[in-house]
UniProtKB/Swiss-Prot annotation:
Catalytic reaction annotation: succinate + ATP + CoA = succinyl-CoA + ADP + phosphate; GTP + succinate + CoA = succinyl-CoA + GDP + phosphate
Chain's role: Succinyl-CoA synthetase functions in the citric acid cycle (TCA), coupling the hydrolysis of succinyl-CoA to the synthesis of either ATP or GTP and thus represents the only step of substrate-level phosphorylation in the TCA. The beta subunit provides nucleotide specificity of the enzyme and binds the substrate succinate, while the binding sites for coenzyme A and phosphate are found in the alpha subunit.
Family from the record: Belongs to the succinate/malate CoA ligase beta subunit family.
Binding-site residues for substrate, renumbered to this chain: 274, 331-333
Record protein name field: Succinate--CoA ligase [ADP-forming] subunit beta
Length: 397
């Protein structure tokens, strides 16, 4: 689960991290009052969407030369004008895709005198099985370019879970970031704070980009992105309350309600599969034959007819879907249950695109019989390779 920047900063501030003062607003009418709560005279007006690259993003409704989703304001009047310009419009960034995201809230923040911009994140490094700090002296908006062009400038420091962030760890991180004087002292305090927040709140990612050294030599968290492990949210009621469903894909919200593992993608072939590994293999083979999957969807091993029906309806609700591939290897999952669920969904929502079904495993003959006797125009496939070729051919004509 993701949260907004202002929510992430409030959370980190509660753990003791150095964060600038700021106020979240939901309408331009609130902009003046928000700015007056801050010291000034420099302000930053930040679009709050669940996507990176806001500073270099562009608003669909504004001219191409208009400023992006993060703007500097040198007066309260500038804050108000920028708020009116940004709220309600659609911000397109590298991470939103061409559809963009509507900006429904802004964060008005006190400006900072920046000397250096650094990058810091905390994540689970699966290569070593530990939580790790990933840091770089090349912070700011272009960290993706740094990672691609000069990966040697990105340093990883793994943390022993039994010891937490030790003095040696802090020294290693500070050395990697080339911190000196007051900034180094601040780092020795900040790194354990961020690690504590990451562990206690079951985060999947904590990204500070940039972490800045100000002209007075002190450290400050200038931007923050936090994602939480969805499997641990049951023990964090305070975090669940921060969820903004308007930032999430409606289909993914529906899938969550039925305990379906669904991720929307940019392709045109919908997939319904049981098992994450088989689902990924199905997406790979669709791509191998020259098409793109529209989603990842794992119905799980113990899906009911109702669950399968819901999954099919979620797929068909995507206007980009031009064909559907159902690929089931029945172990715990029974092929006849899949067949009944698909037919129930088709009868309810109709079948306007080609449908290829590949069934194998438990009750496979019964499942095929149910589909064959349905009278529906369903294309049967013998194996995964055959299924992928048939759905790609049906879509491309």
């Amino acid at each position: 689960m993701n949260i907004h920047e202002y929510q992430a900063k409030a959370l980190l501030k509660s753990f003791g991290a150095p964060v600038a003062d700021g106020v979240a607003i939901f309408s331009a009418d609130e902009a003046e009052a928000a700015a007056k709560q801050l010291p000034g005279p420099l302000y930053v007006v930040k679009s709050q969407i669940h996507a990176g690259g806001r500073g270099k993003g562009k608003f669909k409704e504004l001219s191409p030369d208009a400023k992006g989703g993060v703007r500097l304001a040198k007066s309260i009047e500038d804050v108000v004008a920028n708020s009116k310009d940004m709220l309600g419009n659609t911000l397109v960034t590298k991470q939103t895709g061409p559809a963009g995201k509507q900006v429904n809230r802004l964060y008005i923040e006190d400006g900072a005198d920046i000397d250096r911009e650094l990058y810091l994140s905390i994540l689970v490094d699966r290569s070593v099985g530990q939580v790790a700090f990933v840091v770089s002296t090349e912070g700011g908006m272009d960290i993706e370019t740094v990672a691609h062009d000069t990966p040697e400038k990105i340093i990883t420091v793994a943390i022993d879970p039994a010891a937490g962030v030790t003095a040696a760890d802090s020294t290693a991180i500070s050395d990697a970031l080339k911190l000196e004087g007051a900034a180094r002292e601040d780092g020795a305090k900040l790194f354990p704070i961020l690690y504590k927040a990451f562990v206690e709140k079951d985060m999947a990612l904590l990204e500070v980009n940039p972490l800045i050294v100000m002209t007075n030599g002190r450290l400050r968290v200038l931007d923050a992105k936090v994602s939480f492990d969805g499997n641990a949210l049951f023990r964090h009621e305070d975090i669940r309350a921060l969820r903004d469903k308007s930032e999430e894909d409606e289909k993914e919200i529906q899938a969550h309600e039925y305990d379906l593992a669904y991720v929307a993608l940019d392709g045109n072939i919908g997939c319904m599969v049981n098992g994450a590994g088989l689902a990924m293999a199905t997406m790979d083979i669709i791509k191998l034959y020259g098409a793109e999957p529209a989603n990842f969807l794992d119905v799980g091993g113990g899906a009911t007819k109702e669950k399968v029906t819901a999954a099919f309806k979620i797929i068909t609700a995507d206007p980009a879907v031009q064909g559907i591939l159902v690929n089931i290897f029945g172990g715990i999952m029974k092929c006849d249950v899949i067949a009944e669920g698909v037919l129930a969904a088709v009868k309810e929502v109709g079948l306007k695109v080609p449908l290829v079904v590949r069934l194998e495993g438990t009750n496979v003959e019964l499942g095929k019989k149910i589909i064959n006797e349905s009278g529906l125009n369903v294309i049967s496939a013998d194996d995964l390779d055959d299924a992928a070729q048939k759905i790609v051919k049906a879509v491309k004509g």
